[in-house]
């Protein structure tokens, strides 16, 4: 994962030159975020490294704070990058993690899972998994890190929370995940514990 909330001012000229001269043939054709957070630049760089879908495609996972999900006005850099990802149907899942997992911050974090070779039943949908309660306390705190995700392969008495999370993602069961809803700009506008009225599914349509 990239460092949270790191500005990219020192790289600004190089990045904007690539954006303007290469467009979508380069890494940053979808746009650039605000100067004080380069997370979505890092994500675009990773997407550029994905194997082409006709060659088998790729799946990537990246840990972000909440900023790439929620910040940016309609038509702004963050919004346009999200729109590009949603329109290409690359976002497969978002996993909300427990707080206090990292040494130097206690903020909320999320795993983004992206794929350019989605299985047919996942196409046009984004799965949101709420894993905020899948934690066990650290025996000894390390800075802000007071929790970890239970993993019996590491500590045999742990609950298998990693297995639970990966199982939810793999099974893609209706009703087992929450809904994430996007506006026309690809911005998350609401996250609900239940599906919209009249629809019991636990996945959201991205279109």
Descriptions of predicted regions:
Residues 2-207:
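A conserved structural/catalytic subdomain of Rossmann-like adenosyl-cofactor enzymes
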């Amino acid at each position: 994962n990239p460092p949270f909330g790191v500005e990219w001012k020192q790289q600004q000229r190089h990045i904007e030159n690539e954006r303007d001269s290469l467009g979508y043939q380069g890494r940053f054709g979808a746009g650039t975020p605000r100067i004080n957070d380069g997370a979505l630049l890092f994500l675009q760089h990773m997407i550029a490294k994905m194997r082409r879908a006709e060659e088998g495609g790729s799946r990537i996972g990246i840990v972000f704070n909440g900023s790439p999900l929620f910040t940016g006005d309609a038509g702004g850099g963050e919004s346009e990058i999200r729109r590009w990802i949603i329109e290409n149907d690359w976002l497969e899942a978002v996993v909300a993690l427990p707080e206090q997992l990292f040494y130097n911050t206690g903020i909320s974090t999320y795993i983004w899972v992206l794929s350019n070779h989605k299985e047919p039943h996942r196409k046009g949908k984004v799965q949101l998994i709420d894993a905020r309660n899948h934690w066990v306390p650290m025996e000894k705190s390390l800075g802000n890190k007071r929790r970890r995700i239970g993993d019996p392969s590491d500590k045999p008495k742990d609950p298998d929370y990693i297995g639970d999370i990966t199982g939810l993602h793999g099974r893609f069961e209706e009703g087992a995940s929450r809904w994430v809803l996007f506006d026309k700009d690809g911005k998350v506008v609401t996250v609900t514990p239940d599906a919209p009225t009249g629809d019991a599914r636990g996945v959201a349509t991205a279109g």
